[in-house]
Every structure is written in C-alpha cells, then in structure tokens.
Amino acid sequence: MNAKQREQYWIKVERLRSQLDAKYIALFANAIDKDMKRFIVMLKKNGPEATRSMMGTYVWNEEMFTIMQKLYKEAAILFGNASYRAVGVMSRKAGNPFGLNLDWINEMLTFLTKFGLQLVANMTNTTKMKIDTIISLGIAEGLSSDEIAKMIMEDEELGYAKMRATRIARTEVMRASNYAAYVGASKHEFLVDKIWIATRDSRTRRIPKQSYDHWDMDGQIKAFDEQFTSVDKLGRPVVADIPGDPKSPKGFTINCRCTVGFIPKRDANGRLILKR
C-alpha cells in the first residue's frame, strides 16, 4: 500500500468505527455514572474511612465487562467481514465469509477472556485511585461526607462521565476493530503480511512531543505473526501485534486511532503463497 492507499483505507475503517463510537460512548457513560453514584452512596452511608476500606474489595465493574462483550461481538462481525473481503479483493481471489461469523465471535471472546478483565480492572482502578486521593484530602481537611462527595462530583476528571466514556469507547472500538480485522485476515488459505496504518495529523503520536511514536510507524510492514516495532521517548523498545495490543504500554494504546491492513503475500512470479 502506498501513502494514498493507506489514507483511503484508514478513512474507510474510521467510518465503520464511527458506527460503534456513539453507541458505546453512551453505554460506557451510563456505566461510569452508575459507578460514581455507587461510590457516593457508599460514602454518605458509611463515612470516608469505611468507604476507603470497602473500595479495596471492589475490583472491577461487571457492567463495563458486559458492555465490552457486546462491543467485541459486534466488532467481530463488522470488521472481521470487512477485513476478510478487503484481503479477498486485493488477492483477486474472492472468498465467501459465510459460516465464519461464529468463528470470529468465538475468537474475539477468547481474546476478551484473556485480556478483558484486566482492561476493565484498569479502568476501575483509575477511578478508585482518584476517589481515594480525594477522600484522603477530605479527611485531612476535616470535611464531612457530603462535602467530600461534592468534591468528587466536581472533580474535572471524575465529574465528566461522557468525557471518560469517550476515551474508553474509542480506545476499545479501535482495539476490537483491529483484532477483528486480524482474525478476519487469518481465515484465507494464503499468507498475508500486515501493515501499520496511522493517519498523519496534529493528533498523531510523535516524539518528542509525546512519549510514543505512531507517525513513523505508518507504513511499517511485518509478516502476519511478527510484531510491529517502535521505541519510546527514552529509546526503550515497544512492540505490538496490532494497534491497540493490550500487551503494549497503556500510553501507546489509549486514544490511538491507528488501524492494521493486510497484503496478500506473493512469490517471485506474482502468485499467492498458500499456507502449508
């Protein structure tokens, strides 16, 4: 893929992602709002000290995980099909994805079983740490439960459920879309390479302004089973199977807009290289 083709591919993927963004922003915002109200009720009922102790047993938000399951199932069909068909067009060997939807969903749920609980736990822990800091400050200042609750609700980061939901939803739609595309591309009988596709604009991660780089990763090609490679601001290696890889640093993946494309592998005579 040349730069123009990558740009066109990214635009098509982003249009598909936008179909999911608004829906899941609303669902995540509702779950976050319920979470905040749960903490406030706990605080007013039990007091600051007891609430801090009780928060330690709250590991992750079950509703958030249910939303994640729904998102990943939907992404499996939408992006699995899109990727499968796109690779088929590029290979000039059209494939029929009939019967593969269930396979894609099962692989997505396996992925979510492996990484989803930790992803949701990380989201929950971020909220807990921020609330714990505010409660500690309130205790030190001798504030009442109502006053501490007011501080929590007025906190810029915690108070805007939609802002936090937007960050979570867009990150998870990106992650799910890329893994679904990865699964879809794997179902052909021939080998494919993968290519990192980043949109290059003022928001694209770029060193030294940001700690990680996606700008120079644009166009990087790897064999299907190899990892994309980069370095952070300090020169430390960063690897990823796909954009949004949950094994990569959070700062490398959160709010990422990159996508992954696939290119059929051909031999010296231009023939598709079949899997063995």
Where are the regions a protein language model picked out?
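Acidic, glycine-rich two-metal-ion catalytic cores of nucleic acid-processing enzymes
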Residues: 160-276
